[in-house]
C-alpha cells in the first residue's frame, strides 16, 4: 500500500513533502529501499491468480517501465529490517547515529503523508526515553485496544494506518492485568466500559 509514493518517478515530490525539515537540517539523508513481499491487497492476488509474489512484481514493474533488479527479495529485506508488523506497507524508518530507529508511517486518508504532528511525535520517540505510556485494563469485558470491533478501540489506539491512533501521536501502549501491580511507567490507565466488578485484590492494585 502507498507504493506509488516511493516510486522513482515520484521521488522529487516525495522529498518536497519534507522540505520544511531538510531546509533547516540539510544533513538529513533519505535512502530509498525497494522490495517485494507478501501483500495484504487481496484484489492484487485475485487479478494475478497462480503467480508468485516475485512474478507479480515482475509483471507490474515491466508494465510501469521499472527495473526489476532494484527490488530486494523478502529474505534480503529481513536482513535490514522486518516490516511484517507494518504489513509490508511503504514506511519511513527514522534512524539516529546511535542506531535508534522509529517508524514514520503513511496513512489511509485523503492526506496520506504524515503531517507536522506525526513527524514531531516520531522525532520525539527518537530522542526521548520518557514517552507517555497509556495502559489499557484487560478482562472484565472492557473494550479491547487490540480488536477492531464496533465496541473496541484498535483504530484510535494502535491501528498503524490511522493517523490519529495513539501510537502515531507519540504514546506507548501497554495492556494492564490487575492480577499484577500496575507498571510504574504507566501514566494513564484506561478502564473502558467495564462489564463486571473488580475483585478486592484488583481494587488494591
Predicted regions and their residues:
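Short, surface-exposed patches at the edges or C-terminal ends of soluble domains, predominantly
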Residues: 1-205
Amino acid at each position: 500500500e502507498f507504493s506509488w509514493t516511493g516510486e522513482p518517478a515520484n521521488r522529487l515530490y516525495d522529498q518536497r513533502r519534507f522540505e520544511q525539515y531538510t531546509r533547516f537540517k540539510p544533513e538529513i539523508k533519505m535512502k530509498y529501499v525497494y522490495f517485494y513481499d507478501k501483500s495484504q491487497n487481496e484484489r492484487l492476488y485475485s487479478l494475478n491468480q497462480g503467480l508468485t509474489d516475485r512474478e507479480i512484481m515482475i509483471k507490474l514493474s515491466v508494465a510501469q517501465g521499472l527495473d526489476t533488479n532494484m527490488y530486494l527479495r523478502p529474505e534480503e529485506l529481513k536482513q535490514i529490517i522486518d516490516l511484517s508488523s507494518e504489513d509490508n506497507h511503504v514506511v519511513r524508518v527514522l534512524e539516529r547515529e546511535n542506531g535508534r530507529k522509529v517508524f514514520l508511517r503513511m496513512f489511509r486518508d485523503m492526506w496520506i503523508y504524515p503531517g507536522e504532528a506525526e513527524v514531531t511525535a516520531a522525532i520525539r520517540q527518537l530522542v526521548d526515553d520518557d514517552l507517555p505510556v497509556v495502559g489499557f485494563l484487560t478482562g472484565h469485558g472492557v473494550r479491547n485496544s487490540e480488536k477492531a470491533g464496533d465496541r473496541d478501540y484498535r483504530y484510535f489506539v494502535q491501528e498503524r494506518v490511522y493517523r490519529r491512533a495513539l501510537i502515531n501521536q507519540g504514546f506507548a501502549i501497554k495492556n494492564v492485568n490487575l492480577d499484577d501491580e500496575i507498571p510504574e511507567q504507566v501514566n494513564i490507565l484506561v478502564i473502558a466500559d467495564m462489564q463486571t466488578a473488580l475483585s478486592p485484590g484488583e481494587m488494591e492494585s
